[in-house]
Amino acid sequence: MAEKKDVEINSRADTLDLMHPDIRPWPVTPPPSPEEVAKVYARRKAEDFGKWCEDNLKYEYCFGKPEALQGMRFVCVGLWRLGNKFAGGLLCEAGAEVINIEPPEGDPLRQLTPFGRKEYMLESKITGEKCGLDFIHEMRGQKSVTLNLETEEGKEIYKKLIGMSDAVIDEMPAGYMDSLGLGYRHLSNEFPRLVYCNVAVRGTWGPYKDKTSKFGQWTLEPFGGCANAFVHNTGFPQDQLPRESGGSPTRSGVWFADFVAGEQTANTILAALYWRDEFTGEGQFCEVTGAETQMDILDFDISWYGFNASIKARTGAWDPNLNQYEWNPCRDGYMMIGGQTDRLWYRIGMCIERDFPQFGRLIHEDPILKEMGGRNALEMLIKTYTLTTRWLRDINRIEAEEKLLEYEIAAG
């Protein structure tokens, strides 16, 4: 067996000789070849579907019916981030006109594609330029303009555009727009009705605001996901996934901090516009941070720390707050079971008891299991999850799902 050792990752080249399963820093799944992808596309008639989309989902169709935000215009400015684009997409879906400002060389996000595979990119019929699918997806319904904000001409054009807009979504590094004379404190003097929302990972005024590269491109998940326990409690406990000192945490599979921040940015802007149009007639500066928005959705984690100053431990597939709510392995895969209510809990017991009488006896013999608060104790979770796992390991996914759904249990 290869020697296990700590790995300091500096570049892809540094890790090429570390890809042995026992020492590689991450599981690498090779992407399918272009030939394999072409076969799947042909089988699914992907080209026909693409043509249908081009004919039926044209941009001009966006305004074919009255929309809630029709007539409103928003300006987005930001590089290497999806938050401003996700927020713009939500506003655009409600009928607004959203204009993204890109530098002359374009937003670097245009170049992102899985494993650097150019065949996963779309090519413009007009310019021949290739663009990653994720950028196109997040830019749905929006417009892009090229503008160099670091030139006097670019600044003047930007101000004219702001004068015709309702709100700005700014996801540039803290202080960057101010350094150009284009921040809220500058624009609000000329446009007092302007709503200006900054969306960032670390905010615009705290002690961490300046700890970022020029456009903040490598801080999204590392800070937004790690500073608030999101990454820490996502993964398996130490005894289930040993790696020298214990189990490894797991990052979100998507740029979670930016998407949540983008959603709250859209909500924040709508609230500010309502306040302006219904009450004061004045705009305002708003701020959304990726780290804080993830704190909002950490359910029990904040209170967990507040009650006993402990950080919630990793529990893998089990939810420590509900009995049962987990996925567990079965004979040919995995099965998710949700039993968060008394009704579902007892139905789980009735279902498993048919094949596994021990589960039913456990419920009858231990009165603590009959009450939600009691059965969520660690000892009770271990008892019931252990029996559920034993039941699942002897049946396949189809059998498990059919039996659980027969009792109207949330499963799949």
Spans of model-derived segments:
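N-terminal helix-loop segment corresponding to the beta1-alpha1 unit
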Residues: A2-F279
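Beta-strand segments within the central parallel beta-sheet cores of soluble alpha/beta enzyme folds
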Residues: F74-V75, E282-A291, R361-D366
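Glycine-rich beta-alpha junction loops
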Residues: E105, V201-G203, G290-M295, D332, ...
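Substrate-binding/catalytic subdomain of NAD(P)-dependent oxidoreductase enzymes
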Residues: W218, N267, A272-G316
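Generic secondary-structure signature for well-ordered alpha-helical cores
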Residues: H232-Q238, A271-F279, T293, D299-F300, ...
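A short glycine-threonine-serine/GTX helix/turn-capping micro-motif
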Residues: P249-V260, G283, T315-G316, N323-Y325, ...
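Active-site Gly/Thr loop motif
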Residues: N308-Y325, I398
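Aromatic-enriched alpha-helical interface/lid elements that frame and gate functional surfaces
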Residues: Q324-A411
